[in-house]
Amino acid sequence: MSATVERCDVCIVGAGIAGLNALFTTSQYLSPGQRVILLDRRQRVGGMWVDTYDYVRLHQPHSFFTAGNIGWTLGAQPSHLATKHEVLTHFDHCLDVLRRRVTLDEYYGWTMQSDAEADGVVHVQCQSDDGRTMVVEARRLIKAIASDVEPNDPLPLSSTSVHSVSPNYCDMRTGDIDASNAPVWVIGSGKTAMDTALALITRHPGREVNLLAGSGTYFAHRDRLFPTGGKRWWGGVTFNAFVDEVTQLFDGTNEDEVARRWRERCGVWVTPRAGNFLLGLLSTVERDAIAEGLNDIVMDHFVDAVDRDGKTELQLRTGAVREIDPDSWIVNCTGYLLKHSRPYEPYTSPSGRVLSLNARAATLHLTTYMGYFLPHLMFTDQLTEVPLYELDMIELRRKCNAAFPHTIMTLALHNLSLMTDALPTKVFRDCGLDIARWYPAPRQLLGMAQFLSTHHRRRPHLQRTLDTVAERFDVHCAPLARGSAPTQPVPAPAAGRADHG
C-alpha cells in the first residue's frame, strides 16, 4: 500500500509542552489559512504528562507551565502546584486556543521515522500504530521530541520474596501497595522519589518508608524563589538574581565551590549528603514531612535484591549488604530525564528549515523555553545566523553531574543574551514562561534593567566558561560550524534590546 501524502506549511513532531510552545510561536507567523500538522506517538496531547505517575504535581506555580502566554482556567491560587489531571486539562485548553489561530490537523498514534530535505521541501516519513504510512511534505519541520521521556519500568530483581514496582504503573495510594503494611524502599532521591515518599508518608503515617538515596539530591528552595504575601515585594531570591550569581561565579572548573555557595543561599535537601541538582524545587513543608516520616536514609546505590540463606538482602554499589523484610516493596524512582541517548542531531539543519529540540543539542535550560524561543529565530530566518551554543546534556551528565546545572544556566544566559539582540521586544513580553513575573512589576523591571545593562559585557565570560567545560570534559558545547568558516559573533547593538516591531 502506498503512503498517504499530506502537505503543510509547518510540521511539528511532538505534542508535549515543547511542541505546544513551538505551535504557539508558529501561530504568531502564519495566517489562519496556513496549515500545520501536529503529530505524536501518544494517543493525545500532553507528552510525558500522559505517561507520568498519577500523584505527580508541578514543581513551580502552575501559571508558568503553559504554551506562550495562554492563561490557565483553573481559578486556583497563584502558588498552586497543579496535578496531573489539571496539567492535561490545561494542555487541552492550550490546543483549543491554538486551533482558532491556525489550520491545525492532528495525528496521534503516529511516529516520525525519518526526514529529508529536497528542493526547499522537508519530507517527513511517518508510521501509525496500526502500520499505515504517511509522508508529510512541509516547508518547515520542528522536531519537538525534547527529552523524549519514557516511563520507568520496575527494577529487575533476583529475589522472589519482594515486590518491584514503578510509580508509572503502581499508584502508591491505591491497590496492593496501599493495602500492604510491609516496608517500602524508595530507590532514588530526585523529584519522583520525593513525590513518592511524601505520598506514602501522608497516606499511612507511621508506615516504614526507607530511602536508598544514591549520591543524594538538593533542590531549589521553592519558598525562597516563590515567596508569598508581602515577601514578593522585598523577600526571597528572584530567579534572575540567582542565575546571575551562579553564572558569575562558575568558570567551568569550580562546580563544587559553586554548589556549596548555592546550597547555602537557596538550597533545600532531605539527605545528609546531596551531590546532584537537576533544577527541581522543594518547599520546607515538603522537606520536613519527608524527613520526619522516613524510617531510614541509606546513602548508596542499588544493585540488586537477592534471597540468600532464608534472608532477603539489598546489594549495594559499595559492596555493602542490607537485610530487608520479606514482602518489602522496591519502588524505582531513579528518574526519567536525560536517560535515553538518541544520536546527536544539531538544533538546526544548514538551511534552517528543520529545527530539532533535543537534549544532545540543548540551547536553553528548559524544553519549554527552547520550544518558545527557537521557532522565533526560525521564522525570522535567523536560526542559522545567531551563533547559539549547543550542549550535549546527556554526555555532560555522564561525565560530570556536578557541573551540569551550572553549565545549563550559563548556556541559557549566554543564548538568551544573543536572542535579546536578535528578536523583537514583543517576543519577550509574550513569554508567559518567565518566572520572574512571580514578583511585582518594580522588581521585574529592576531585574530586566540589570540584565540589559550587563549582558553584553558579561557574554565573553559565559563563552569562556562554556569553552572550558567543553575542553575539560570533552563534551560537545559550542556554536554550530557554518560551512568551513568559524562562527563569528553577531555584532551587539550599542545598548538595550533590538525592537523590530
Model-derived features: positions:
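Rossmann-like dinucleotide-binding core of oxidoreductases
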Residues: 4-7, 11-12, 17-45, 141-262, ...
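Feature captures the FAD/FMN-dependent oxidoreductase FAD-binding
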Residues: 77-151, 278-279, 286-315
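C-terminal catalytic lobe of FAD-dependent flavoproteins
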Residues: 262-340, 436-497
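Conserved N-terminal/central alpha/beta ligand/cofactor-binding core
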Residues: 65-96, 245-277
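N-terminal glycine-rich dinucleotide-binding loop that anchors FAD/FMN and/or NAD(P) in oxidoreductases
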Residues: 52-76, 227-247
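Short secondary-structure boundary/capping segments
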Residues: 53-56, 158-159, 225-229, 344-351
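Glycine-enriched catalytic-core subsegment of oxygenase/oxidase enzymes
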Residues: 198, 297-451, 481
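Conserved Walker A/P-loop ATP-binding site and its immediately adjacent core
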Residues: 49
